[in-house]
């Protein structure tokens, strides 16, 4: 008999330790809390998209105008980020005011400048005496291979995303940072599929953990419940899905790929009170949600990055293991929603279209 604890056992123990009952789902009868909703279900969080109409690209802002404690964990080998060193628990700044996710590769990091302008106009930022400096970390994904690469999100795009932000359910699929996202690229873009951005939330009594993810992975996306591929690499004729890893094991050769031409980026947020050390741990655990749904993941071609935010709006303390475990579940659900909400474009079909 296997005596090692399962993921469900760990979640059950964490909930018992934290003293919370599950609002949607019953741990006692073996069910994991149900997911749905969005990251905006977390108090203190707003989301806004800017989607460029000239080619599939854009940016997505996660606003925390009252400030949120933040952490980060980077697992891919080709990340593109801004203002992430300050999230190290050893460093001074304790709160951020927004996280920017953007297409456009490194050019897209300029969207954070637009978010800073938006926040400064509203008197929001880290008080340095002579000014308030908005703290806006950012991460980007590579979508320059979809359409005209000279068109990419800039500071104005970031500003417009902030102006569009609200606490309502955000759009999913081919919008914002997910507008140019694709998956299943191990055998080249000619066999890839369209992806997008997705969101989800898990609610327990008195606390919420939410996620939003722009899925631009080199690997395939799987539904962990069934083990089936939802979106990914296609056969050479483009008419059906293949399992990339199984194809490789059967001897199919990979074409030359350039590092950094993929990347999945996302944010998890909760309304519980967390420290910088704890948010960093939550971001680390949240990557398990990518590992459950994407294969291969965290590759040399990806810059997979997850931020974690704690708004503290519930005023509740919570077991960090519980929050991290729920964050991984929320990330996994957001990944699935990202590919299922996507719609195909020329040469890139979406899930359900083949």
For the regions a language model picked out, list residue spans one by one.
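Bacterial Sec-dependent signal peptides at the C-terminal "C-region" and cleavage site
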Residues: 21-32
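N-terminal secretory signal peptides and thylakoid transit peptides that target proteins
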Residues: 2-18
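A structural signal for small-residue-enriched, beta-sheet-centric alpha/beta enzyme cores
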Residues: 32-106, 110, 121-354
């Amino acid at each position: 008999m296997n005596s090692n604890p399962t993921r469900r056992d760990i979640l059950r123990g964490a909930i018992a330790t934290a003293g919370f009952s599950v609002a949607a789902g019953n741990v006692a009868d073996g069910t994991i809390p149900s997911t749905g909703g969005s990251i905006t279900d977390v108090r203190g969080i707003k989301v806004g998209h800017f989607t460029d109409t000239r080619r599939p690209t854009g940016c997505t802002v996660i606003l925390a105008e009252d400030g949120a404690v933040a952490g980060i964990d980077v697992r891919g080998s080709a990340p593109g980020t801004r203002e992430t060193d300050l999230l190290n628990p050893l460093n001074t700044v304790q709160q951020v005011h927004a996280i920017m996710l953007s297409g456009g590769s490194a050019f897209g990091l300029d969207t954070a400048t637009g978010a800073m302008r938006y926040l400064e106009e509203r008197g929001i930022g880290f008080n340095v005496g002579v000014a308030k400096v908005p703290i806006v970390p950012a991460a980007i994904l590579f979508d320059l291979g979809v359409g005209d690469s000279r068109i990419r999100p800039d500071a104005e795009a970031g500003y417009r995303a902030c102006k569009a932000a609200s606490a309502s359910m955000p759009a999913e699929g081919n919008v914002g940072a997910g507008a140019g996202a694709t998956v299943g690229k191990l055998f080249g873009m000619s066999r890839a599929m369209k992806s997008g951005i997705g969101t989800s939330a898990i609610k327990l009594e008195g606390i919420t953990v939410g996620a939003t993810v722009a899925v631009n992975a080199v690997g395939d996306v799987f539904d962990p419940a069934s083990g089936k591929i939802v979106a990914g690499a296609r056969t050479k004729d483009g008419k059906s899905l293949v399992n990339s890893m199984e194809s490789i094991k059967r001897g199919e050769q990979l074409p030359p790929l350039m590092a950094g031409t993929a990347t999945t980026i996302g944010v998890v947020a909760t309304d519980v009170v967390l420290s910088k050390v704890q948010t960093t741990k939550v971001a680390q655990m949240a990557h398990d949600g990518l590992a459950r749904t994407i294969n291969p993941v965290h590759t040399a071609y990806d810059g997979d990055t997850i931020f974690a935010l704690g708004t503290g709006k519930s005023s509740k303390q919570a077991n960090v293991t519980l929050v991290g475990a729920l964050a991984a579940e929320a990330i996994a659900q957001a990944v699935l929603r990202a590919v299922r909400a996507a719609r195909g474009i020329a040469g890139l079909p979406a899930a359900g279209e083949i």
